[in-house]
Amino acid sequence: MKYTKLAAVALASVMMLSACGQSANSDNQIVMTVGDTQITESEFNYYMNTYKENYNMGQAKKSSLEYCQRNQLIVEVAKAMDIKLDSDTQSKLKDYQKSIKDSYDREGGYKKFLKDNNLTDEYIDTLASVSYYTDALKKQTETPTFTEDELREYFKEHYRRVKYVLISTIDSQTGDEVSDDKKEEAKKTAEEVLEKAQNGEDFDTLISDYSPNTANDSDENGYIFTDNETGIEFEEGVDSIKANEFTLVQSDSGYYVIKRLPLDESQECFEEEYENEAETINTTMQNNAFYEQVQKWADEYGIKVTVNDEV
C-alpha cells in the first residue's frame, strides 16, 4: 500500500498544526472559522501540503479539515475555561518553542520559513502550545477505561481485511504519473483482473501474477487497515462490498482490484491481528472520548465552527 501514517514526532506535529488559527488577511478567503479565529486559504494550504506528502488529495483534505478544527477547538476551549499553564509547563513550552525555531534555522532560516508560509513568530508559539493545552484539558476530565468486549467490538467495526491487485499508474523509475495511453492500458488490465476474479480464478495467483511485492503479497492474512488510514477511494470501495466480493477502485497511484475478506472471531487470524492492534485501539478510543468532551465544552461555551465549502 502506497499510503503511510504521519510520523508522530514533535516537529512534524507542529508542521501539521501550522495551518490553524492565524488571523485572516484581505488576500485570502476564509476556509474555516472556529470561535473567534479565522483560518485562511493560505494557512489551510500549508496544512494540506504537509498531509499530501503522506496521503492522496482526498484524504489530505479530509484529514486537514478534521485536525485543523480539532486543534483549534482545543485552543478556544482552553481560553474559554481560562486554563493557565503552571510555571514548569511554561518553561517546557519555551524550550519546545526554541527547539522548533532552531530546527528551521538549521534548514535555511526561521524568518524565511515564516515569510514563505505567511506565518508569524507569535503564531508558531501558539502552535507549540496546543499539546500543552491538550494535557491541561485532559486533567479536567477522567480518562475512560474500556472492557475487552468493547475493544474487540471496535476492532470488528472499524477495521477491514482485504487482498488486492494494484495496477500502478506511477513510473517506478521517476515517481511521476505515466502517460494517458499507459493509464488506459492499466485500466483495461485492472478490468481484466476483476473479471477473472469474479469468474472464480484464484485471487492469490492473480496477486502474484499482476501485483507482486505489495503489502499483501507475502501475508496470507491480507492487508488490515482502519479508518482514515488509506485513501478515501480505497476505504469507500472496501466499504461498498461484503466479504468475498470484489471491486475496482481508481486512486492516485493506480487501479486497485480489491477482494474484501471476513474479519471476525471465526477467522484463524482474528486473535493475532486483534492482539497486534489492541493497544492502538485503546488509545484511539480514549482520544475519541477526549475529543467528544472537547466538543461538549465547545457547545457549552457557544464556540461554533463554520466551514466554507466553496473554497
Model segments located where?
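N-terminal targeting/tethering segments
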Residues: G21-E122
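Surface-exposed patches in mature extracellular/periplasmic domains of secreted proteins
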Residues: I83-T89, D202-D209, T247-V249
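Peptidyl-prolyl cis-trans isomerase
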Residues: T189-I232, P262, E268-E272
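C-terminal motif of bacterial Sec signal peptides marking the signal peptidase cleavage site
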Residues: M15-A19
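PPIase-associated folding chaperone regions across multiple families
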Residues: S23-D27, N49-K61, K112-E184, S208, ...
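Positively charged n-region of N-terminal signal peptides that target proteins for export
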Residues: M1-L6, A10
